[in-house]
């Protein structure tokens, strides 16, 4: 069947996701500003970002990005109703627990780079490094991925990748935390903890026809070290406030499915599904659907929905009369059983061949009575 000109364009976009060669590479600068606001003015995030992608000949592509965000607001933590102004100075016996929004501010900066190297066979090796830093958390991640073309027509590829993350957790105030030792001489923290994350993923991508593509992958990850949140408290025996304690190991695995389809000359969609499970008894399902409508040669509209659901961790409870002498205990709602829905809209405006503008608005609702709005505006310049 012969495709019209617009379908050829959509087919090219679809194929370029699979055919990661310099023929389809772009040199560009992307600048965005993201604003995130939770309901009841709980948490607000302002995050400007910049990304640069540069192709060096036919064998190398470099990508560099920088994000800096300012976070402010309050997070619900169990504190003593009489003396509790923070997570730490509320800890002890004979307390009167109350869940209170404790205010905080944070400045966070993260940077990443990746380098794609293409071999004579046009197989690809991608090496990437990212670093994220804030006053009490320092994350460093190194990853490598190998992509192999199954045949000369390049309609199928296999990839295998691995990453290692080293996280430094700086606990600033441990006056009431018996686990804390002498202050860290470099950071000034009361205690310096670390955690390690090792992840692997294996996948296959298949170009079905000129308008559709499918990708499937499986993943496995292990975490060890300090996996608790130093600011979260747990109520034991109804009147004792102590630091939460999570296991120091975590093993997770699952799979991802992706399907991309150009239905008509102006309508295309991306379907994603993710299954995740771990030995903390958390199992989650994620369904993500994004649809795009090309209104004309300059304007593309986007709309989508993301649904997420998970079961609760084996050591989680929301009740203050639940925990006694259990080894592991947490009141963190992120470990609870919940579901969430995100509604997404976007507009992309192509001002010229080299310059385009974008704006998107996402509405997030979670069954734990949390809701938020994401707004992103920016531009992309091809050079």
Provide a role label for each language-model segment.
Residues 46-50, 109-113, 140-144, 158, ...:
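Hydrophobic, lipid-facing positions within transmembrane beta-strands of outer-membrane proteins
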